[in-house]
């Protein structure tokens, strides 16, 4: 039950944060030139994607015989190279497309964030009817695009005018409609609205707590500083541990996997920095 609740909003929340970071960067003078944005996101997102995919994910998947293709070459080229089944790394390609789409739309056609948010919601709902292969995670980019614009909107929105009861009502209303309807497009629309409400509630809650106090703890500083490295490396470590320790009781396996995957990811991050290869992680 707890896992279901977390999975309901954790990716929308991450995308919203990415949109907020983009908005803050743009306010400080970044991303004014499309070419510089493109080069920056290739270096920050696609270089880590192919580095981690080929040196960590592919060997792990093939070594543990987890690939669904009969040929290892098919997995190596079709699924990883073209981003069709890239495990947790799909987020890098999706985020790359979101940066490009947002910069293109806001730079040339649509300056109003609300208009962009509405159009993104229409595209997101339309993605529920997407059939076929999701090349380079483009469908996932469209699916989560509203949350990127939401993050941008939350940055420019006057925080004093945002009341907690509004997103709470949105979540409750959306949940009720989801229970009462059996329409695919309505389910997609109100699932999206419910996620939007949950993300806004989380963001408003974070604003009310002492963020500075949270950031002052040394462990939190370490995790935040190396969070991208943890994201890149933790899944292959989890695959290996679960494969060899699957007979352990679940109450032992889960915390053990969680702790060791974080420590292992921090270790790989530190090694790459020591070797001056942090560029392979997008730094």
Labelled PLM ranges:
Residues 99-121, 153-170:
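Solvent-exposed interhelical
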Residues 4, 8-13, 26-60, 69-87, ...:
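Transmembrane alpha-helical segments and their boundary/interface "anchor" motifs
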Residues 210-224, 237-283:
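C-terminal "closing" transmembrane helix and its immediate cytosolic amphipathic cap
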Residues 2-11, 79-93, 128-149, 177-201:
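Interfacial loop-to-helix transition and helix-capping segments at the boundaries
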Residues 20-24, 98, 102-106, 144-160, ...:
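Hydrophobic transmembrane alpha-helices
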